[in-house]
Amino acid sequence: SVLVAMIVWMIVGYAIFAVAFGAAASLVSRQEDVSSVSMPLVMLSMIPYVLSFLMATGDTNSMTFRVLSFLPPFAPFMMPARLVLGVSSWTEQAIALGIALVFLPLLVRGAAAIYTRAVTRTGARVPLKEVLRRAERA
């Protein structure tokens, strides 16, 4: 049913963004600095949210809407909208869910790498570029 699909997408979307925010939060050691790393992610998470509304009120069967709805950060917002609007089949829902479930462990692995490289630093905020540079050397 549609309600079950919406709940599944909510859980998958929550997991994707929770892992991303966890990785970002590991870059700071002081509570006061959390907003500086979380604000860009908040803004990025608003893009799929707003696009899902804009596309749902426009041409619901556009190629852009269809392609974006398969990308993991966009799928939790766009696939439920496409399902409710009747422009998505259960096969498309399953494919998008499969892509998101493959993406999630990769995201967790990347977040874990960021965390392990950033946790050794204390004091000032660790720039993401520095963490990624350490990853290249390791």
Ranges and model annotations:
Residues F53-V102, A138:
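Membrane-interfacial helix-loop-helix junctions in multi-pass membrane proteins
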Residues M43-D59, R125-V126, E130-A138:
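Hydrophobic alpha-helical transmembrane segments of integral membrane proteins
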Residues A18, G22, S45-P48, M55-T60, ...:
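Membrane-embedded alpha-helices and immediately adjacent juxtamembrane helical segments
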Residues A23-S29, V102-A138:
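Junction motif at the cytosolic side of a transmembrane helix
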